[in-house]
Design a protein with these regions (language model features):
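Catalytic-site signature segments of enzymes, centered on catalytic residues
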Residues: 83-85, 91-92, 157-243, 253
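Active-site-proximal loop and beta-strand segments within enzyme catalytic domains
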Residues: 40-43, 47-63, 79, 89-92, ...
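Active-site Gly/Thr loop motif
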Residues: 232-240, 289-344
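N-terminal leader/targeting segments and the immediately adjacent pre-domain N-terminus
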Residues: 1-90, 113-119, 147, 181-185, ...
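Active-site helix/loop module of the DD-peptidase/beta-lactamase fold
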Residues: 96, 115-153, 185, 212-252, ...
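Structured C-terminal helix/loop/strand segments within mature extracytoplasmic catalytic/sensor domains
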Residues: 1, 5-14, 327-380
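Active-site SXXK
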Residues: 78, 96-121, 145, 206-210, ...
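Active-site-proximal alpha-helical segments within enzyme catalytic domains
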Residues: 202-209, 251-275, 333-349
Length: 380
């Protein structure tokens, strides 16, 4: 992958944009066709709202600039009301969600649960995937990987090139395959279900268990979802190797879609329906939007992650009731859902890779700004 633009993000330029826009040019992938496209109804209007954060009040335009936004899409009650794209990005571009992919995985997992294909979230993942009957996942349940409370001995550290996390990502980026073969070798750590730790292998184990239970790959599951919500454009699912060499989806972070179509996933998380037709059950939506344990509530997660959100079923709730949730991906990819206001805000970005200070500052600002944008848009 080559970058066509580079500069420090605080002047509005994008670092390594090409790794986030149409990212399939840099990795093995499968395309998810848009077989039943249904464009959003539109009532586009200017959007102005003050953004308060970092001790000052700024404008929406300045917020987009200083956080290196690449796209902003706002949908209120199923109507597209605001749309903006940064330089070099268009409404047709598929934008890599990074770990926002995990929230898409939660939705297709919900479909499997609703259909009884995963009848019990408290079943050990090893009962669905025999290869996981050893190692750190031996006693871990589907519920525990959904809530990232597996307790396995994993550190999400991509700065150390020799860390297991870096090795896993390298296998994907280099197309070496075999990502799933690494999962049984992850050791145990703490008692499952007793603490939260951000763990991308939990997402990969979840998808492996879902695939085993349903007989469908992530690409096939997303294809069904894409048809149900009338996606306008094909999406992309990244693989760890070519299909003919047994490549599987990197379910923790390699899904790309247009900003408009990312908004469809947010709209589905409002109440589980599409145009009044049930897609995912309200029971699943409610459960996935809320923290199940006190230590999963907003403000209770490790402060190195966020002080603004908790954790549900691969969604980040901003309150104990799950009224406001976020899909959150590395380098500034967000799908914010205000469920009572039936409003979705998609913001994609091109933050510098590996800059922990920049990431934390911008992430904190986005967790303050996106709710304000949703409230202003819903108010008309």
């Amino acid at each position: 992958m080559s970058a066509t633009m580079s500069a420090m993000s605080n002047n509005g330029a994008f670092e390594d944009l090409e790794s986030l826009r149409e990212p399939q040019r840099g990795f093995h992938h499968l395309e998810v066709p848009a077989t039943s496209p249904s464009p959003w109804p539109e009532s586009l209007r200017p959007l102005e709202c003050p953004i308060t954060g970092a001790g000052r009040v700024t404008t929406l335009a300045e917020f987009l600039r200083v956080t290196s936004a690449t796209a902003l899409v706002v949908v209120v009650d199923g109507v597209l009301v605001h749309e903006w794209y940064g330089s070099g990005v268009s409404r047709e571009d598929r934008l890599l969600g990074n770990s926002a992919t995990k929230s898409a995985l939660a939705l297709v997992t919900g479909l499997a649960v609703d259909r009884g294909l995963i009848p019990d979230l408290d079943v050990p993942v090893g009962e669905l995937v025999p290869a996981l009957r050893v190692g750190g996942y031996e006693r871990v349940t589907v519920r525990q990987v959904l809530t990232m409370t597996s307790g396995v001995g994993w550190v999400e550290d991509y700065h150390d090139p020799h860390s297991p996390a870096s090795q896993l990502i390298a296998r994907w980026r280099q197309g070496l395959g075999g990502v799933r073969t690494l999962l049984p070798g992850i050791p145990d750590g703490e008692e499952p279900g007793t603490r939260y730790a951000y763990c991308s292998p939990d997402s990969m184990v979840l998808d492996w268990a879902r695939e085993s239970a349903t007989g469908t790959t992530l690409t096939e599951a997303v294809h069904e979802l894409w048809s149900l919500v009338g996606a306008e454009h094909p999406a992309v699912v990244g693989l760890d190797a070519p299909v003919d060499r047994g490549g599987v989806a990197l379910a923790a972070g390699a899904f790309a879609a247009t900003a408009r179509d990312w908004a469809r996933l947010g709209r589905l998380q409002v109440d589980g329906t599409w145009d009044g037709v049930p897609v995912v059950s309200p029971t699943w939506v409610e459960a996935s939007s809320r923290p199940e344990q006190p230590f999963l509530r907003p403000g209770r997660l490790p402060s190195t992650l966020t002080t603004h959100a908790g954790f549900g079923y691969h969604w980040w709730p901003l309150d104990d009731d799950g009224d406001r949730v976020m899909a959150d991906g590395m380098r500034g990819q967000f799908v914010y859902v205000d469920r009572p206001r039936r409003t979705v805000v998609v913001k994609t970005s091109a933050w510098p890779y590996g800059d922990a200070w920049w990431d934390r500052q911008c992430r904190d600002l986005c967790y303050l700004a996106l709710p304000a944008i949703a409230e202003a848009a819903a108010a008309g």
